[in-house]
Amino acid sequence: MPRTQRNDNFIDKTFTVMADIILKILPANQKAKEAFVYYRDGMSAQADGEYAEALDNYYEALKLEEDPNDRSYILYNIGIIHASNGDQEKALEYYNQSVDLNPRMPSALNNIAVIYHYQGEKAREEGREEEAEALYDKAAEYWKQAIRLAPNNYIEAQNWLKVTGRSEMDVFF
């Protein structure tokens, strides 16, 4: 049985019903509609912590989806799963693919920055100061891009940029 037919909570059921109605009235081709069903099922599985099932659905959606913007969100969600599973390199790969298709996605830019910052922290803990600084600089560049797109978000990142002297631009109010 498809995941969308076994949702147990009210919000998931409501979302599924609304998505089905939208799919029926939107002038989308069958392939795009099928891609959306896989994407929707992937999101549902991801929300339930069923990451393997979510990835299966996202990969199927990627095979069908042609719109670059929609593909960017699928890739972004795949990145989130890999990050949640501790595979930062794989997460970076998918976040970067997402940003390549949609450079105006601050959440992906932020997540890239978070990974570089984390890697910088690890390098510093291991006494690799130069590498840590290079990773922090990478994190700063991605956070600046995210903040330019969403200046009211990422307050902790804005503060970190200021405290570390990496905020030479005036996007922070």
UniProtKB/Swiss-Prot annotation:
One of its GO terms (cellular component) is plasma membrane-derived thylakoid membrane. One of its GO terms (biological process) is photosynthesis. Gene3D superfamilies: Tetratricopeptide repeat domain. InterPro entries: PSI_Ycf3_assembly, TPR-like_helical_dom_sf, TPR_rpt, Ycf3/AcsC/BcsC/TPR_MFPF. It is found in: Cellular thylakoid membrane. TPR repeats lie at residues 35-68, 72-105, 120-153. It is a peripheral membrane protein. Keywords: Membrane, Photosynthesis, Repeat, Thylakoid, TPR repeat. Coiled coil: none annotated. Its main location: membrane. PANTHER family: CELLULOSE SYNTHASE OPERON PROTEIN C, TPR REPEAT-CONTAINING PROTEIN MJ0263. Belongs to the Ycf3 family. Essential for the assembly of the photosystem I (PSI) complex. May act as a chaperone-like factor to guide the assembly of the PSI subunits. This is Photosystem I assembly protein Ycf3.
